[in-house]
Amino acid sequence: MADLTDPAIHAFLAEGTRTGKIGWTAKDGRPLVTPIWFLVEDGTIVFTTGKDTAKGRALARDPRAVLCVDLQEPPYAFVQVQGSVTLSEDPDQLRHTATDLGARYMGADRAEEFGRRNGVPGELVVRLHPSKVIAALDMTA
């Protein structure tokens, strides 16, 4: 089975500013999906979200989630990560994660700005622990 420590999968997920599409189950059972900024860290997918958002409340209630990251031009590719999340409100971890996300998606010069803005009370660090990883890194082959 593929996993996030596979160098090719890790490189694909960590390249540039690709967003992930995170899926979860709403309270009424509907599947929901939204784009997120994310990091690959210690064999997990890490992102932040508001504790009182639909996503934050849903993941607190039901930790099952799936992430899909894709390449939308040739050679077309995707990685899907299925698993369960853990949530943290630790302020140091939150500030660190928010700063690292800011660096990846907005550039090093704006990392601290995004860390201050998003690493605040009421936000969560979400860590997706993979139970299954599916990857197709060259769909034209």
Predicted features along the sequence, with ranges:
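Charged, gly/pro-rich active-site loop segments
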Residues: M1-L4, F78-A141
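Extreme N-terminal tail/first-helix region
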Residues: M1-T17
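Hydrophobic alpha-helical segments typical of transmembrane helices
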Residues: T5-I9, K55, T97
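Alpha-helix boundary recognition
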Residues: L13-E15, A60-R61, G119
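Short beta-strand segments
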Residues: R18-K51, L59, A65-V69, F78-Q80
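Short, solvent-exposed aromatic-acidic interface loops
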Residues: G50-A54, Y105
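Residue-level signal for well-ordered alpha-helical positions
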Residues: A58, D62, M139-T140
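Short His-centered aromatic/hydrophobic patch
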Residues: E73
